[in-house]
Amino acid sequence: MSPQTETKASVGFKAGVKDYKLNYYTPEYKPQDTDILAAFRVTPQPGVPSEEAGAAVAAESSTGTWTTVWTDGLTSLDRYKGRCYHIDPVAGEDNQYICYVAYPLDLFEEGSVTNMFTSIVGNVFGFKALRALRLEDLRIPIAYIKTFQGPPHGIQVERDKLNKYGRPLLGCTIKPKLGLSAKNYGRAVYECLRGGLDFTKDDENVNSQPFMRWRDRLLFCAEALYKAQAETGEIKGHYLNATAGTCEEMIKRAVFARELGAPIVMHDYLTGGFTANTTLAHYCRDNGLLLHIHRAMHALIDRQKNHGMHFRVLAKALRLSGGDHIHAGTVVGKLEGERDITLGFVDLLRDDHTEIDDARGIYFTQSWVSTPGVLPVASGGIHVWHMPALTEIFGDDSVLQFGGGTLGHPWGNAPGRVANRVALEACVQARNEGRDLASEGNVIIREASKWSPELAAACEVWKEIKFEFPAVDVFHKGKKKN
């Protein structure tokens, strides 16, 4: 080999493998206002120290790899690397730790949830040195938030569009979720909307199947929408699911909904993907459409308490990517959701500012500046007896969505909707009069049922229905405040 082509190790470079903690565990580091902060629940493999595990997470989700590389010398790793700056043991758990990691903002593309997640929850989740890894929370800095459009419209603009104030909005998912023809589907929509609903909804499974193509469904739903509006004098909506196999097809469906004069469309944001969701959110703002978001696939990601990603992170990501509604559990229905934890991410969706809150599982103070809020949707196994609890838990700025709790009424769809509307109005009136919905809820519903045979029939059908199972997602104290 000639002297000109001989490869020599540069000064300061030594090949080999180094412990991650030598470069990526920095307990002396003070997080910057512009850093993205992450709280990971880390379960190391036996024999792996917590400092090495936390540093490995910081390294593998930022600039690090398994061995030293000579190109490290071509950049400033101190500027770009993630840093594990604090570790707390998880109370009540063996060999589990909350590891806090700070990421410099320059690691992430502006306005891209896709890029943010590709780094923070990418390959590191398959790292062999870890038995399990869960992202519990993120602190998104204001500087990064301002690169996103966020929700197309937000809570106040939606209320102004609908001219509905002072109460939760009411919705219903059309059932059976699959198998109806477009005409029969439209008939069910009409019966629900004329009975007192604000919205009806495509099920998340409904896209464009052989039994009901999307264009036919939209046409019959639009007919039902306008007929119900003419009869009731109220503005109505149907969540037309625009989710499709390609972004181009998704936008085509949203365009058709706008041409029909529909006020709202829908997207399955996790199965559809964040790039598609952000694209649709931008279209909706530009064209005056509200955007309803379903979270199908979330439990695959967030239900296991030791591995995956907590829904509060997915909720923050949705507020960045864009959506005016998102399903958020019910606390009292058939789906997983402990009360305080649920209210924690409901606050993250609606409020301009949230503080650290142990009881609600919020690890970081989060400011949303001018980003519009998102309406939480309570849906899944709820009926009229749940109405007082739902009104008390979620408050006015929410959507209470009954599927089987409407269409399962013994007298049909329209009476089912009447029952729910009467129950809601009774709860709102009682609350405004100063009554305690938590303790007097059943009394309030029984009193209202004396004046509504539809509500009385619903009360009889669902009087024994309960979903009482312990929540998997509970908060373990023993964390550092940031």
Curated annotation (Swiss-Prot):
- Which positions correspond to the propeptide? 1-2
Q: Which GO terms describe its biological process?
A: photorespiration; reductive pentose-phosphate cycle
Q: How is it modified after translation?
A: The disulfide bond which can form in the large chain dimeric partners within the hexadecamer appears to be associated with oxidative stress and protein turnover.
Q: Where in the cell is it found?
A: Plastid, Chloroplast
- Where in the chain is the site Transition state stabilizer? 334
* Annotated Mg(2+) binding sites: 201, 203-204
Q: Which residues carry this modification: N6,N6,N6-trimethyllysine?
A: 14
- Positions contributing to substrate binding: 123, 173, 177, 295, 327, 379
Cellular component terms, GO, for this chain's entry?
chloroplast
Q: Does the keyword Oxidoreductase apply?
A: yes
Q: Which residues carry this modification: N-acetylproline?
A: 3
Spell out the SUPFAM superfamilies in the cross-references.
RuBisCo, C-terminal domain, RuBisCO, large subunit, small (N-terminal) domain
What does this protein need as cofactor? Mg(2+)
Q: What is its main location?
A: plastid
**In which domain of life is the source organism classified?**
Eukaryota
Q: Partners and quaternary state?
A: Heterohexadecamer of 8 large chains and 8 small chains; disulfide-linked. The disulfide link is formed within the large subunit homodimers.
Known PANTHER family for this protein?
RIBULOSE BISPHOSPHATE CARBOXYLASE, RIBULOSE BISPHOSPHATE CARBOXYLASE LARGE CHAIN
Role summary: RuBisCO catalyzes two reactions: the carboxylation of D-ribulose 1,5-bisphosphate, the primary event in carbon dioxide fixation, as well as the oxidative fragmentation of the pentose substrate in the photorespiration process. Both reactions occur simultaneously and in competition at the same active site.
Which family does the similarity line name?
A: Belongs to the RuBisCO large chain family. Type I subfamily.
The protein's name is Ribulose bisphosphate carboxylase large chain
